[in-house]
Every structure is written in C-alpha cells, then in structure tokens.
Design a protein with these regions (language model features):
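Terminal, low-structured helical/coil segments at or just beyond the last alpha-helical repeat
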Residues: 2-9, 156-194
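Structural marker of alpha-solenoid helical repeat scaffolds
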Residues: 4, 38, 72, 106, ...
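Alpha-helical segment of the N-proximal tetratricopeptide repeat
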Residues: 8-44, 48-55
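Helix-start (N-cap) detector for alpha-helical repeat units in TPR-like alpha-solenoids
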Residues: 8-9, 43-44, 77-78, 111-112, ...
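Structural signature of tandem alpha-helical TPR/SEL1-like repeats
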Residues: 21-33, 55-68, 89-102, 124-136, ...
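A generic tandem-repeat structural signature
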Residues: 68-123
Length: 194
C-alpha cells in the first residue's frame, strides 16, 4: 500500500533533512526530487535544490531551480536575492542587478539585497550609483563592517576624502581591524586608532 501524498511529502522532506545532517547532499537532492514528483511547484524542494546545486558549483541547475521557484512564488524576495547572488557569481551583472532590485522592490529593508546590488554596481564600475544601496545597507546593518568598508572604498575611489575619513573614523569605533585595512588601502588615518 502506497502512502498518501502528504505523508510521502513529509517523509521525503524528513529523509532529505537527515541526509543533509549527515552531509549526504547527493541523497538529499534525490529526496527533494521525489518531493517535486509529488508537486512540481513545491517551494521547499525547489529552494533546497537551488541551494544545493549552487553549493556544488552546478550554477545552471541552480539558476533553473530558482527560476522555477520564482514562477511559483514571484514575490519571494529571498529567492530573487539568491538568484542575484548566483548571477553575480556567474558574471551576469545586469541580471544580478535586476534580481537584487526586484528583491528590494518586494522588501525595501532587505539589507543583503542592497549590499549585493552595490557590489554588482561596483563590479560594473558604476560607483556613484553604488553609493545609494551602500548607504541603505549601512543604515539597515549599522554594526556590520562590510557595507561600511565598501562605502569607504567607493568614496575613496570617487576622490571624496572627507567622506572616506568619516566612514573610516566610524568604522574604527567598532571594527578596528577593518579600519586598519582601510588605512593601508587609502593612506588615511583613523582619528580613533592609536
């Protein structure tokens, strides 16, 4: 006697979770595939396949899984963000920027989407444009050094010494190691570091 679909789905989900726990990603992918046989639009299975194939470097498969997931859940900001991250990793900057912008349109407070958009803009040498998402990222994540570091680098590359100095001084208050790295890169000195 075959299990009803909800029980089978639960069973496959549990088996996939155990496989992940024991680092058997190949088997986990098989169980997620079985979940898709029951429901081709299962968001958990699609997201899990996308993440696992991306981690294995199987980018096209991951991208296809994210696309399928977004066909089912078009307003999933996380999926758009992750798709953007994957596209940036594949050097498809315009697609990455579009995905990050879509994530931000859905969730304006998605700090990582702002950061991802900024990194894509920096990679495309669109430094002036990168300032807006960097400033939003540092507002949303004021204690994360990554946005501040990139903001200082962009300000420095744009020749804005005063703004770079302000960011460097701010960063030195809570992340002196990163501030010292910026000192080496910019030639500026943080007023709060000895």
């Amino acid at each position: 006697m075959q299990m009803p679909n909800p029980i089978r789905r639960w069973f496959f989900d549990q088996m996939a979770a155990w496989c992940m726990l024991f680092r058997r990603r190949d088997l986990a992918l098989e169980y997620y595939g079985k979940m898709l046989e029951l429901d081709p639009g299962d968001p958990l299975a699609l997201a899990s396949i996308a993440f696992q194939t991306a981690q294995q470097g199987r980018r096209q498969e991951a991208l296809a899984a994210f696309d399928r997931l977004l066909a089912v859940q078009p307003d999933d900001a996380e999926a758009h963000f992750n798709r953007g991250f994957l596209l940036e990793d594949m050097n498809e900057r315009e697609g990455a920027m579009a995905a990050f912008r879509r994530a931000i349109a859905i969730n304006p407070d998605h700090d990582r989407a702002h950061y991802g958009l900024a990194l894509s803009l920096i990679s495309a040498r669109r430094l002036e444009e990168a300032l807006v998402p960097l400033k939003k990222n540092t507002k949303l994540q004021p204690m994360s050094p990554y946005g501040w570091y990139q903001l200082a680098r962009v300000q420095h590359e744009l020749g804005r010494t005063d703004e770079t100095q302000q960011v460097l001084d701010h960063l030195a208050r809570f992340e002196p190691k990163i501030a010292r790295q910026l000192e080496r890169e910019t030639g500026l000195r943080a007023s709060t570091l000895s």
